[in-house]
């Protein structure tokens, strides 16, 4: 067994990452967003209320409008935070109105509200009124299917499946992501599948290999793409050097 692995590793040491997938930055730190906007690897941005709170955002509208003046020409998603569908619609229309003609603003709508009530009727209505949506917090194939059916024939839409959080439950998200991709492709060319809640750099490779349209990841995860195909012996040496440096800085003795 180990001989077969050694033979394989000698001839297949490269990552299968092809760079075809669109990589979005997931976060709400203004500095990181502006810095990453000039990075050709980054093709879009996603935010949510939790990330904004973590980043210390106090004025939702002011933050979003300022970001839009600094990040132009790349898709960016802002999420509604209302829980009642009437108010959710009002917020969605307001957010969509921040688009100045670049067609880069996407409104994030959760698949259900906090009461577990389906957002599908609102999703269908908004999409067919021309609002570009990022339907978020999807975990099941049924949710993906219903969403794709709702936005079919509507405005451009992103379907965000939280693959990382699915894996946190002990389930392999890849089969569901593959089935979801087939549905999105067959339903409408305006629908893109997004791999959300990236847990490790390898997820970027997984999503790319399977043909997923988009993956969103935090800045620290995206920076690891630069390490793809690094010589593993170099990684070993760097690791041991770090151990040595930290033990010296800590002043350890035996």
Give residue ranges: language-model regions.
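N-terminal amphipathic/basic-hydrophobic helices that include classical n-h-c signal peptides
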Residues: 1-9
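Metal-centered catalytic cores of metalloenzymes
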Residues: 11-14, 40
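Short beta-strand/loop segments at the ligand-binding rim of alpha/beta enzyme cores
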Residues: 16-24, 102-106, 128-134, 186-195
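Active-site beta->alpha loop and helix N-cap motifs at the rims of alpha/beta catalytic domains
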Residues: 18-34, 38-42, 46-125
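Glycine-centered loop/turn motif at secondary-structure junctions
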Residues: 40-41, 56, 99, 103, ...
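Catalytic alpha/beta core domains of metabolic enzymes, predominantly
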Residues: 117, 124, 132-223, 229-242
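Active-site loops and adjacent core secondary-structure elements that bind or stabilize anionic groups
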Residues: 247
């Amino acid at each position: 067994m180990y001989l077969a692995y050694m033979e394989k590793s000698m001839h297949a040491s490269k990552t299968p990452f092809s760079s075809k997938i669109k990589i979005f930055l997931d976060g709400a730190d203004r500095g990181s967003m502006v810095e990453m906007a000039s990075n050709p690897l980054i093709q879009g941005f996603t935010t949510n209320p939790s990330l904004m709170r973590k980043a210390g955002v106090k004025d939702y509208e002011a933050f979003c409008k300022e970001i839009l003046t600094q990040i132009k020409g790349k898709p960016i998603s802002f999420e509604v935070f209302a829980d009642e569908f009437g108010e959710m619609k009002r917020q969605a229309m307001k957010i969509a109105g921040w688009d100045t003609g670049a067609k880069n603003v996407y409104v994030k709508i959760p698949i259900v509200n906090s009461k577990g009530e389906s957002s599908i009727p609102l999703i269908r209505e908004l999409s067919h009124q021309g609002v570009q949506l990022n339907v978020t917090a999807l975990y099941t194939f049924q949710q993906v299917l219903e969403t794709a059916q709702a936005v079919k024939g509507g405005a451009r839409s992103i379907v965000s499946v939280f693959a990382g959080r699915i894996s946190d439950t002990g389930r392999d998200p890849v089969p569901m992501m593959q089935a979801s991709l087939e549905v999105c492709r067959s339903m409408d060319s305006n629908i893109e599948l997004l791999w959300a809640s990236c847990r490790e750099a390898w997820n970027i490779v997984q999503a790319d290999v399977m043909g997923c349209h988009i993956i969103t990841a935090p800045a620290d995860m995206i920076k690891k793409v630069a390490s793809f195909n690094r010589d593993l012996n170099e990684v070993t040496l760097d690791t041991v050097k770090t151990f040595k440096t930290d033990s010296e800085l800590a002043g350890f003795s035996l």
